[in-house]
UniProtKB/Swiss-Prot annotation:
Domain DFDF: 284-320
SMART domains (alphabetical): FDF, LSM14
Gene Ontology CC entries for this record: cytoplasm; cytoplasmic ribonucleoprotein granule; cytoplasmic stress granule; cytosol; mitotic spindle; P-body; ribonucleoprotein complex
A Pfam family annotated for this UniProt entry: FDF
Stretches with biased composition (Basic residues): 269-283
Phenotype for residue 22 to E: Abolished interaction with EIF4ENIF1/4E-T without affecting interaction with DDX6
Similarity field: Belongs to the LSM14 family.
Entry GO MF terms: double-stranded DNA binding; double-stranded RNA binding; mRNA binding; RNA binding; single-stranded RNA binding
The name this protein goes by in its record: Protein LSM14 homolog A
Lineage: Eukaryota, Metazoa, Chordata, Craniata, Vertebrata
């Protein structure tokens, strides 16, 4: 390689240590990572070179391949860069593009996870390195030494600074090749699945660039070309496809959410009632335990009661109970008055109608045998469950139990279920309400019960 000619854009023949020959356009040389990148690469296989694993040639043309410097055996220049025709320095020219001379390097397209690569406007170091390789993944710190780009033309003058910088890169690359040094940064990148088809190296594993390189700070905005506009149109159409397919994906996701697992009770189809919760028997305190700001004042509470009146009333009650027990033990006219149901009923009727004791008198044995204190003691029938529960609530207070709500969804229609009206099990279908709920799903007035249709039950003896 001569020191005065830059080889960016030259056709390079590269032979790896696995005796595989590649041909492509020299893209860039990274001295930090000891890598060489070729664009439009084609593999010719091992050909007739002696090797343990002969590889046939391939017809595919790879967009770019990054080679590790320690695995390169030989690197020769097949064709020099094509001559560049620059426009005259005319201040009237704002922007220019060459479409015919860049046919071999246009239509690069987009590269999926690596982003869209701009097209080559010319075989210039700035357009090749600054524009395209910033989206591929080579470190951008080594890309700043390949020249600058003028703002009024699409070509670059190849200056002596470019050639000298390239000479330094090639010399350092030769030294690294002789030493056999490989970049430690590429070791974790060898097994990347995104570049297995696009990047091929001479080693057993394929290295893949992962870090997105920076653009050259000295290069200005690239000039648009016809292929660049075509790439933008292609991206616009791809974005429209994504926007159109997104509602379809959301619809499929919603449909998957609406699917009911097998064995679960289906919801009513003709639900008429909304959420009918809030009919709980006893309200559940959700604010936690009560917090008292100060201690209970027993002295002021005791001052509100008259101890003498309480003691007098208590002794009167004890005396009345003793008199009652004595009278029950003594027979009246040879018969126990409590055993005669007729006399008891008549006495009860007279006591209720006339009220001989008066409102302030609880017991007077001269007027009546019965008192006004324990009026429920003489009842022969047992109290009902509702009455006993009411008395317990009045005496001991209301127990605060969780999960006593009576509500739930009371939809009327479809093949719903009416489970959960009782305390535990359901009354229809397979749905069983949790224990303690009186509600639950109360659908199911239609369907199997035929509640919405008029019919007559016929028996063997007639309607």
């Amino acid at each position: 390689m001569s020191g005065g000619t830059p080889y960016i854009g030259s056709k390079i023949s590269l032979i790896s240590k696995a005796e595989i020959r590649y041909e492509g356009i020299l893209y860039t040389i990274d001295t930090e990572n000891s890598t060489v990148a070729l664009a439009k690469v084609r593999s010719f296989g091992t050909e007739d070179r002696p090797t343990d694993r002969p590889i046939p040639p391939r017809d595919e043309v790879f967009e770019y391949i990054i080679f590790r410097g320690s695995d390169i055996k030989d690197l020769t220049v097949c064709e020099p860069p094509k001559p560049q025709c620059s426009l005259p320095q005319d201040p009237a020219i704002v922007q220019s593009s060459l479409g015919s001379s860049t046919s071999s390097f246009q239509s690069m397209g987009s590269y999926g996870p690596f982003g869209r690569m701009p097209t080559y406007s010319q075989f210039s170091p700035s357009s090749l390195v600054g524009q395209q390789f910033g989206a591929v993944g080579v470190a951008g710190s080594s890309l700043t030494s390949f020249g600058t780009e003028t703002s009024n033309s699409g070509t670059l003058p190849q200056s002596s600074a470019v050639g000298s910088a390239f000479t330094q890169d090639t010399r350092s690359l030769k030294t690294q090749l002789s030493q056999g040094r490989s970049s430690p940064q590429l070791d974790p990148l060898r097994k990347s699945p995104t570049m297995e088809q696009a990047v091929q190296t001479a080693s057993a594993h394929l290295p893949a660039p992962a870090a997105v390189g920076r653009r050259s700070p000295v290069s200005t905005r690239p000039l648009p070309s016809a292929s660049q506009k075509a790439g933008e149109n292609q991206e616009h159409r791809r974005a429209e496809v994504h926007k159109v397919s997104r509602p379809e994906n959301e619809q499929l996701r919603n449909d998957n959410k609406r699917q009911v697992a097998p064995g679960a009770p289906s919801a009513p189809r003709r639900g008429r009632g909304g959420h009918r919760g809030g009919r709980g028997r006893f309200g559940i305190r959700r604010d936690g335990p009560m917090k008292f700001e100060k201690d209970f004042d027993f002295e002021s509470a005791n001052a509100q009661f008259n101890k003498e009146e309480i003691d007098r009333e208590f002794h009167n009650k004890l005396k009345l109970k003793e008199d009652k027990l004595e009278k029950q033990e003594k027979p009246v006219n040879g018969e126990d008055k409590g055993d005669s149901g007729v006399d008891t009923q008549n006495s009860e009727g007279n006591a209720d109608e006339e009220d001989p004791l008066g409102p302030n008198c609880y017991y007077d044995k001269t007027k009546s045998f019965f008192d006004n204190i324990s009026c429920d003691d003489n009842r022969e029938r047992r109290p009902t469950w509702a009455e006993e529960r009411r008395l317990n609530a009045e005496t001991f207070g209301i127990p605060l139990r969780p999960n006593r709500g009576r509500g739930g969804y009371r939809g009327r229609g479809g093949l719903g279920f009416r489970g959960g009206r009782g305390r535990g099990g359901g009354r229809g279908g397979t749905f069983t309400a949790p224990r303690g709920f009186r509600g639950g799903f109360r659908g199911g007035r239609g369907g199997r019960e035929f509640a919405d249709f008029e019919y007559r039950k016929t028996t063997a003896f007639g309607p």
